[in-house]
From Swiss-Prot:
Keywords: Cell inner membrane, Cell membrane, Membrane, Transferase, Transmembrane, Transmembrane helix
Zinc in keyword set: no
Gene that encodes it: lgt
Organism encoding this protein: Acinetobacter baumannii (strain ATCC 17978 / DSM 105126 / CIP 53.77 / LMG 1025 / NCDC KC755 / 5377)
PANTHER family tied to this protein: PHOSPHATIDYLGLYCEROL--PROLIPOPROTEIN DIACYLGLYCERYL TRANSFERASE, PROLIPOPROTEIN DIACYLGLYCERYL TRANSFERASE
Name of the protein: Phosphatidylglycerol--prolipoprotein diacylglyceryl transferase
One Gene Ontology term from the biological process aspect of the record: lipoprotein biosynthetic process
Binding site for a 1,2-diacyl-sn-glycero-3-phospho-(1'-sn-glycerol): 138
């Protein structure tokens, strides 16, 4: 069994100002996305550093607003009704990927209108930069001791740990780390490699939806369902899995459509 590194949730103390690890992870996520997007812009015609900076700003707004609102609506609506101010206490944790995803989609519409880019041109450009943000977010969950995994059933399992935030004090899977590695690092490697060569428009976005859909669906088997949600369908499907299935199906259709149309935005087969 591993020992949980009981880290102070406040990363930096500056007098009355406290910087929480959760907020710091989001800052690192946005900085990493900006760096990766800036690198990609240098490899593509029609992209500038100002466009990238604006894109990250729009994306950050979409992630924070959509992620928080989505978490409240999907998972903690009763808590919000009891204390509406809690919606704005982002540093306490509680963000929904699916809400953040929808928030980014809406934000990208405004950015595309401003810079005269198509939606899928933009999403294909952004998609490989997203998984690193997911990775940092899950690390923030781990440090905060939230969204931990299900109880370990094998007493000889070497990676289980007891989270101090768990009222039952059971040996559990560190599912946040599993998700950081699968939904974050592994998906980043796959998307970065796939997007390094000319692909049909929508293909990179499709692979992101498919890759995240598979990774999240599998990781949910290790993650403890929210206490007020439990298993919603068939006695084993969680809210996260139900929300992820449409992403996977849409991604499959998009990949098929992309290779049927074969519209290229860069490379030797670029279409005007």
């Amino acid at each position: 069994m591993l020992t949980y590194p009981n880290i102070d949730p406040v990363a930096i103390h500056l007098g009355p100002l406290q910087v929480h690890w959760y907020g710091l992870m989001y800052l690192l996520a946005f900085l990493c996305a900006w760096g990766l997007a800036s690198y990609r812009a240098k490899q593509r015609d029609g992209w500038t550093s100002d466009m990238v900076s604006d894109l990250v700003f729009y994306g950050a707004l979409g992630v924070v607003l959509g992620g928080r609102i989505g978490y409240v609506l999907f998972y903690e609506f009763d808590k919000f009704l009891e204390n509406p101010i809690w919606l704005f206490q982002v540093w306490t944790g509680g963000m929904s990927f699916h809400g953040g995803f929808l928030g980014v989609m809406i934000a990208m519409l405004f950015w595309c209108k401003k810079y005269q880019k198509t939606w899928f041109q933009t999403l294909d450009f952004v998609a490989p930069c997203v998984p690193t943000g997911l990775m940092f977010g899950r690390i923030g969950n781990f440090i905060g001791g939230e969204l931990y995994g299900r109880a370990v059933t094998d007493p000889n399992y070497p990676f289980g740990m007891i989270f101090p935030t768990d009222p039952l004090h059971l040996v559990r899977h560190p599912s946040q780390i599993y998700q950081a590695l699968c939904e974050g690092l592994l998906l980043f490697i796959i998307l970065w490699w796939f997007s390094s060569k000319p692909r049909p428009r929508m293909a990179v976005s499709a692979l992101f939806l498919m890759g995240y859909g598979v990774a999240r669906f599998v990781m949910e088997f290790f993650r403890q369902p929210d206490a007020d949600q439990g298993f919603i369908l068939f006695g084993w499907m969680t809210k996260g899995q139900i929300l992820t299935v449409p992403m996977l199906l849409i991604g499959l259709w998009m990949m098929w459509y992309a290779y049927q149309k074969k519209i290229y935005d860069w490379g030797p087969q670029k279409n005007s």
